[in-house]
Amino acid sequence: MRGVALLVAALTVVAPARAQRPLISTNPETPFKLATFEAAGKTRVGLVLGQRILDIEGAHTAVVQELALRGTPAMPRDMRTLVEDYDRIAPHLYRIANRFRDASADNPAFAFNVERVGILAPIKYPYNLLAIAANYKLHAGEMFPPGSPPQKAALDADQDKENPVFFAKSPRSCIIDPNEPYVMPPGRNIDWEGELAIVIGKPALNVTEATAHDYVFGYSIMYDVSDRGGSGRPLTGMFPGPNWFSGKSRDKAAPFGPFIVPKEFAPNPPHFHIVTKVNGTVKQDGNTANWIWNEAHMVRYLSSILTLYPGDVISSGTPDGVGAGRKPPEFLKPGDVVTIEIEGIGTLRTPMKAAQ
């Protein structure tokens, strides 16, 4: 027995040590954005790190093989599924970001230059696309005659004393991709409205303001294309006042993207600087810190009326500086290019195109 023990000890000493695989953190240490993109004829879900965009399926497979991991979930092939399953797959996305954060380290086949792929609307398509009206006092004020009772009411608006007004856009009919031209309806007055888009992360019904942020997934950019050309109804007729459907819900009237920033990499509260330009000229320059109804109020109010689902989008209102509020009014024409820049998210670009 003593000889056997000595032999085992000797083999233990001379046996080569098994190589230690590197440990890669599954904590959110490397900020990233998410995108839906097209490359090599395939639509993919991407993780954006600076100027690189990683196909999450390919990146996940590479990390699993490198670390010899077992029992890891498959990566989703569309953004809405990713949002629905985020709690389960987030650690694996964090691991991917931490592994590939050094762009100079390698250039795998699943990594692309973000400028050389087709960036699509991040979610095609949410169940609900809901937009708030007049959520900035200065914008609300610019839409009414100076000194008028409606303008005074707008400038005095208080989220604790009244509820907001929302309208719906059809996700399937309205959402278009970044850089996709908006085909202008003939004879209409098309305006610019740059907005922060809030993406819902969990089913939300009758939530409180205290818990509302728990139901948010992240943030993107929405262009609330607005038709000011005769969308109102006669004050003496049936249902007087603005016709929100014709003014806000025209075909392709919701350019969306380019990226989603998960909330763990965004400011809380979500105070973002928004700049809207037409042909490079600044038209709107605002900050979501100036909302009348804040994120918690919007989510609480909407969820008191209907269920919000993962991937649903709330377009949170536009700052002052729209064309209809200028003296004289200004509207877009074919050939114009609208860009909406939100710090920390990106730039949404929409060219205007004449109808054929």
Which stretches of residues belong to each language-model region?
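Bacterial N-terminal signal peptides
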Residues: 4-13
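Sec/Tat signal peptide C-region and signal peptidase I cleavage site
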Residues: 15-19
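Active-site microenvironments in enzyme catalytic cores
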Residues: 20-39, 61-62, 68-282, 297, ...
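Charged, cofactor-coupling segments
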Residues: 21-27, 32, 38-44, 48-62, ...
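Residue-level recognition of short, solvent-exposed, well-ordered loop/turn junctions
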Residues: 124, 131, 309, 333-334
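Generic structural signal for buried aliphatic residues
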Residues: 196, 314-315, 338
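A conserved acidic, glycine/proline-rich C-terminal tail/linker
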Residues: 294-332
